[in-house]
Amino acid sequence: MSGKHNSVIAAIGIDIGKNSFHVVGLDGRGAIALRQKWSRGQVETRLANMPACLIGMEACVGAHHLSRRLRLLGHDARLMPAKYVRAYSKGQKNDFRDAEAIVEAVQRPTMKFVATKTGDQLDLQALHRVRERLVSQRTGIINQIRAFLLERGVAVRQGLRVLRAELPGVLATRCDVLAPPMVRIIEDLAGDWRRLDERIEALSGEIETLDAGMPAASG
């Protein structure tokens, strides 16, 4: 059962790990015909030598790339949200049990699958995530500048653009409450803010360019 799979395999579940993959295959009767641990480099080689079948995986890191590769080999690769797979887990959790749950889940007619992303779609997703992180960093810097000013009794009206426009004047004229060390600190933060603005603007342009004419994901 663990190494031999003379029976025709109808469906396979793959539990994706960083370096190893746990694979469980069922025959047409639902009996386990394959139960093996493969290295990352073995996955495509092994599956290239097997008849086309249904293959399920959780939609985790690396799953979209592998799904595309397995589809090129002729397999019907499908991705599922991990939360929907959990309902099919049996017994104590381990990697092979996870693969068993995946192969059970992928055969369910009511399963809600995740569309396999193209390379461009993954690039677009990455750009959005990086931009979101930079926007969050910028917000943190702006809040810190406001907090430092308020601690010294200097209030600036709300709004990113307002603070950007008024900050140079505040630093130049409020030397009565802003000592030189604090002015330098805020000027350094303002420099970080400007650099983040430039990076965010550049990423926004990349996102707009890549998003134009983006093909729909395959299901």
What are these regions (language model features)?
Residues M1-G219:
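A detector of single, family-specific signature residues
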